[in-house]
C-alpha cells in the first residue's frame, strides 16, 4: 500500500498559506472531480472510473492531524475500458453494485513529512471495511495568489487488493492489485 497522502497536502498548504489557521471546510465539485482506476488484464490494462458523489473535506493548513476526509462513490455508475469489463465490474463477483451501491472512505489519521502527506483511513467496498493509506498532493489554480485557498485540486493516489474486499471474480484473468487516482476539485464552503 502506498504511504504519503493528505499529510503532504496539508504541509504543502501550510507552507504556502501561513495566514489561515484552523480546519477549513471544503465542498466538492462532483462534475469536475474524477476517480479512476487500473488493473492488469494479462499483458494489457483494464481502466475505468467510478463517479465521486460526495466528499466532506476539512483541511487544517497548520496541523495535519486536524484534517479529515470522507468520500462516497457511486458504484452503480462505474465504467470500464471495454463493455464486458464494465458489466463484470458491477456484477456480483466483483463490486456487486446491486447489493452495495456505494463505496466509502473515511480518514482516521493524516500525517506529513516535508511536502508529502499520507491519509490513512477505512475503505468500505462490498460491505467490507479495510484500512488503506493514500498519498495526497494539493494544487492551486494557475495564476491564483499563494494565499488563495478558496479553490483547490486534491490528487489522492493509492493501491488496494480487490481480494481484501471479497471482489475475487475472474482472478485467473484480472490482477488483484487495483491502482486508484482520485482528483477532487474543491472550494471553500460558505
Segments predicted by a language model, with ranges:
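Positively charged n-region of N-terminal signal peptides that target proteins for export
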Residues: 1-4
Amino acid at each position: 500500500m502506498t504511504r504519503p497522502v493528505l499529510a503532504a497536502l496539508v504541509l504543502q498548504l501550510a507552507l504556502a498559506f501561513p495566514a489561515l489557521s484552523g480546519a477549513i471546510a471544503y465542498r466538492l465539485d462532483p462534475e469536475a472531480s474524477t476517480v479512476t482506476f487500473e488493473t492488469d488484464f494479462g499483458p494489457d490494462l483494464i481502466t475505468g472510473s467510478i463517479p465521486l458523489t460526495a466528499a466532506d473535506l476539512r483541511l487544517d493548513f497548520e496541523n495535519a492531524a486536524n484534517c479529515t476526509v470522507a468520500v462516497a462513490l457511486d458504484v452503480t455508475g462505474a465504467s470500464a475500458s471495454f463493455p464486458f469489463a464494465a458489466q463484470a465490474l458491477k456484477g456480483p463477483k466483483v463490486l456487486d453494485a446491486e447489493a452495495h451501491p456505494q463505496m466509502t472512505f473515511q480518514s482516521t489519521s493524516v500525517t506529513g513529512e516535508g511536502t508529502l502527506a499520507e491519509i490513512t483511513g477505512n475503505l468500505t467496498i462490498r460491505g467490507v471495511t479495510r484500512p488503506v493509506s493514500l498519498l495526497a498532493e494539493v494544487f492551486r489554480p494557475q495564476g491564483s495568489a499563494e494565499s488563495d485557498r478558496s479553490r483547490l485540486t486534491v490528487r489522492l493516489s493509492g493501491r488496494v487488493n480487490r481480494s481484501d474486499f471479497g471482489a475475487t471474480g475472474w482472478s485467473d484473468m484480472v490482477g488483484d492489485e487495483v491502482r486508484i487516482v482520485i482528483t477532487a476539485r474543491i472550494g471553500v464552503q460558505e
